[in-house]
Amino acid sequence: MSGHSKWATTKHKKAVIDARRGKSFAKLIKNIEVAARTGGGDPTGNPTLYDAIQKAKKTSVPNDNIERARKRGAGEEAGGADWQTIMYEGYGPNGVAVLIECLTDNRNRAAGEVRTAMTRNGGNLADPGSVSYLFARKGVVTLEKNGQSEDDVLMAVLDAGAEEVTDLGETFEIVSEPQDLVAVRSALQEAGIDYDSAEADFRASVEVPLDVDGARKIFKLVDALEDSDDVQNVYTNIDLSDEVLAALED
């Protein structure tokens, strides 16, 4: 199993823990609100909204919160904020590339919090385009194994545009082009295969291998960035070997 795959597993476990703590609820709610505003409030005709709602349900966001967010975004209920998506780029310790995706109603606050988190943790912001070229936008679906083999999943999604299926230990990850994400998700549903999440993601084209000390520094930086309510996602181009991940888990 590659270092990248085990890192993806670590991220998946961390997301579950964060969700249980309630840390990610507000971010999931914002995704629903924005999806409803940009594509309409009917999930059956708005795949992005459908997937945002499904992810929120999978992470135990209360149905009442989900429905209120959908209504705010669709204009059926007052109180929706003017959310804006902003991407920041920078470098962390050891030259690791960092993409920071913000969803905010206050650009100045978001910029200040991102800058502070970066500078306090060995990072620095960079000019637009100086880091993003190292990443490609992809569609990513994750699902629990539930007794299915990699071949079972691959056969279900191959004709829908899936590029690869990766075994992450407890889960499978399916990667496609962003425009094929809905088709891949629909193919799983037609095959009766349940999935955890389906969303657009950034994947690095060039990765930086790190030792244990370097990995700890990057985790500290990512945690500091994710502590901001304005930060939705943080992407890096780190590559962690099995040995480094084992040492981090001890």
Curated annotation (Swiss-Prot):
GO MF terms, alphabetically ordered: DNA binding
Gene3D superfamilies: 1.10.10.200, 3.30.70.980
One cellular component (GO) term of this entry: cytosol
Keywords attached to this entry: Cytoplasm, DNA-binding, Transcription, Transcription regulation
Localisation: Cytoplasm
This protein's record includes keyword Ion transport: no
Domain of life: Bacteria
SUPFAM superfamilies: YebC-like
Listed GO biological process terms: regulation of DNA-templated transcription
Family note: Belongs to the TACO1 family.
UniProt-listed PANTHER family: TRANSCRIPTIONAL REGULATORY PROTEIN YEBC-RELATED, TRANSLATIONAL ACTIVATOR OF CYTOCHROME C OXIDASE 1
NCBIfam families, alphabetized: PRK00110.1, PRK12378.1, YebC/PmpR family DNA-binding transcriptional regulator
HAMAP family assigned: Transcrip_reg_TACO1 (MF_00693)
Protein name per the record: Probable transcriptional regulatory protein RER_29220
Organism of provenance: Rhodococcus erythropolis (strain PR4 / NBRC 100887)
Lineage: Bacteria, Bacillati, Actinomycetota, Actinomycetes, Mycobacteriales
